[in-house]
Amino acid sequence: MTIETVSENKAFGGVQGVYRHVSAATGTTMTFSVFVPDHAPGATLPVLWYLSGLTCTHANVTEKGDYRAACAEHGIVFVAPDTSPRGEGVPDDEAYDFGQGAGFYVDATEQPWAGHFRMRSYIEEELPALIAAEFPVDMARQGITGHSMGGHGALTVGLRNPGRFRSISAFAPIVAPSRAPWGEKALGGYLGADRAAWRPYDACALIEDGARVGELLVDQGDADQFLTEQLRPELLREACGAAGIDLTLRMQPGYDHSYYFISTFMADHVGWHAARLG
């Protein structure tokens, strides 16, 4: 695998880069960003994955996420992939919550999406192999986080791969997409009408079906316009309570769904992951 450098800029003593490569999983060119803090020659660093939300690319968190100072302080590599395949020949939908920019971190089985929308394979298999080959990372020390649709991605990828991730957190995640309009539309469109096929992509369903991790951290603004209909954090609290998973769910007064919220608590999440990644 080879990558092309789109840009590299010095930041907080390290390098913030944007890169692209041809993906076998999606059959498209994919773009992602990586922040590598300053480090000793030959050292390998823990890595924190960040999965973005609906309509986003890698650029949203890269430009507005305010993670670099904390990652530089703690010596953590920060990786931000795109949210879907893009480009000529890639199917799309006019709605903001389906198609390009709304991959939901699934491997689609329905047409016309199945040919390119293989974000689960991309995030779980292809991109980690590329990052391990090209950057100074210690793949035995991985954490994952994300926002909204990406919070759903972080929770489900983490729950499906408990041996890979030492730490899992989320900002305003869609915790039970099978019981939320965004999720029902996306999972039905990408995976078909059989709801059994949706369960590996639903954090609460995964926990109900036996997935276990030691702990989870979730921050949620109580002024989030999507709180009651789409996000429903109380369902995750119920699922974790029944399963004995240590969930820290922090309802943050007055915060909405935006990057103003994410950037406020990003350094805290990076520090929380750092304490678990060593």
Where do the protein language model's features map onto the residues?
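Non-catalytic cap/lid and distal C-terminal segments of serine-dependent acyl enzymes
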Residues: 1-278
